[in-house]
Amino acid sequence: MSFASSPRLFWNFTSTFVASRTFPRHRIWLRNIAQPFSTAKTTPNLLSQMEKHAHPAQFPPVQSLSPRIPSMSPHFNEADRIEKYLHEDGHRAWGFVIYRCTYESDTAWEEFMRRILANTEETLEGSGGLDLLDNLAVTVFQDSSFDGATAAVVRDHFKRWAATAAQQEQGTGPGFSERYLYCIQVTQDVLDSVLADHDGFVRLVRGDWKEYDPYEEGERVEEEHEALEGCTLENVGWMQVPFDGVMVIPWYFLRGYGWEREYRRPPTVACF
């Protein structure tokens, strides 16, 4: 059964809003970037829901810190670590922004979204963290202008969005939140890998990456690699990460200087 036809989910393409019945704590908004919420063609009820979830600061406060699984150290518990970082940043909402960059099949896209939501719930359940679904904000940018877009195009849009999003969503600055540092890019090869195998991969794009000079005093200090989207540097500003647990595991592994530690140049898939 497709994501769109599933009786447990409601997907309204006209309003570009998804309300999940499978995951009642989820509220997902899919926004056409050229159209503000105030002008979206939708019913008053759906518009009200969209406006509500465009401001995650209205989400419930994160619960007080407490180990969910007594037999496991909070340091090794994914949910405990996400909760800890939310407290540190003074935030309520978490979750990577997703960019849809392939439009060959809506059915395939719907299945991808179904899988990423199911996988996120399953990952959190394993660490006793289903309560964090209350604070999960999944923002998807989908517009035909992103069809076939490079990581550089996605990064440019993401940086402009992130510049003001934290204040609008959280009512405070971005802190060290991964939500405003990284985003997920779904290209056709990403989609194919996920639908062909649950061990597929997605692209994770670093928002603040800048091209750097590989030369020092006239000598190249790193190997010149095969060009990826025109870049021959070792660090191209994006990497491929496992689909399994993608909303949860990179969230805490990339905290601080995690990118420098975990980065692998594509096509190698990073292993968290």
What are these regions (language model features)?
Residues 2-4:
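Fungal secretory targeting signals
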Residues 216-272:
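Acidic, proline/glycine-rich low-complexity IDRs
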Residues 6-234:
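Extended, charge-biased low-complexity segments
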